[in-house]
A protein has these predicted regions:
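Start-transfer (signal-anchor) and selected internal transmembrane alpha helices
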Residues: 1-27, 42-103
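Intramembrane catalytic core of multi-pass membrane enzymes that act on lipidic substrates
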Residues: 87-186
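Residue-level marker of positions within ordered structural domains that often coincide
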Residues: 1, 12, 34, 127, ...
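Membrane-embedded alpha-helical segments in integral membrane proteins
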Residues: 31-32, 45, 170
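Transmembrane-helix motifs of polytopic, lipid-linked glycan transferases
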Residues: 24, 70-80, 182-204
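Alpha-helical transmembrane segments at the extracellular/periplasmic loop-to-helix junctions
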Residues: 63-70, 162-163, 167, 190
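Alpha-helical transmembrane segments of multipass membrane proteins
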Residues: 27, 104, 165, 195-199
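C-terminal TM-helix exit segments that contain a strictly Trp-centered aromatic cap at the helix terminus
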Residues: 29-37, 107-108
Length: 204
């Protein structure tokens, strides 16, 4: 167990915390334009300010990518305060991670629409069909809230996910029903805790 950070190191740690938080906020804002927003039940639909990033997608993608790079650098910078004779406390680390997690927790999915396929297959499991035999379209119907957000390439495709993930997904589906926003949030919280992944991965 190392000694607490001195004043100079503490100020440097706070700058690193702010740097990482800025990166995650950039990712969250950029995801409003470059992210994989749901086709229906989009809570930002009709909100003029929140829909602005979708009209400047190149800028949004740049913001998201810049934020991701900043987040990766912040992780590396944070490491210096977790090693050596003087280290940040557990509470300081927890506050830092929480600050970095929140923007990514509420941001739209980024870089991939896989989460919608996962939610659709989880719903198929919940209603008693075999997700390894039917895809979202034949299992739920083309007009189902989850199917509509699944890329057309995968709407007929059976589940590629393992039994454990589908079991977890069935529980999420039972809890959230057809509320796609609540399902995405639960998916992020539950699966990432189980997988033990970094906050930077929470937006997937």
């Amino acid at each position: 167990m190392g000694s607490p950070l001195n004043d100079v190191e503490y100020r440097a740690m706070r700058r690193t915390r702010l740097f990482g938080a800025t990166g995650t906020v950039l990712m969250g804002i950029g995801a409003l334009g470059a992210g994989a927003r749901p086709v229906v039940q989009d809570p930002t639909f009709g909100v003029r300010l929140l829909n602005l990033p979708s009209r400047i997608q190149t800028v949004s993608l740049t913001m998201t990518t810049t934020g991701a790079v900043m987040m990766a650098l912040a992780w590396l910078m944070l490491g210096r305060f977790a090693l050596g004779s003087r280290r940040m406390s557990r509470s300081q680390l927890d506050r830092t991670l929480l600050l970095w997690m929140v923007p990514l927790l509420i941001a739209p999915p980024m870089y991939s629409k896989d989460v919608y396929s996962y939610l659709a297959q989880s719903q198929i499991t919940r209603i008693g069909l075999n997700p390894y035999e039917v895809g979202p379209a034949p299992g739920l119907g083309l007009d189902h809230v989850f199917t509509l957000s699944v890329p057309s390439l995968w709407r007929e495709t059976p589940a590629p996910y393992g039994a454990l993930l589908l079991w977890i997904g069935r529980g999420i589906s039972a809890l959230t029903g057809e509320n796609i926003v609540a399902a995405v949030l639960c998916h992020r919280v539950v699966v990432r805790i189980v997988a033990g992944q970094r906050p930077a991965d929470w937006a997937r």
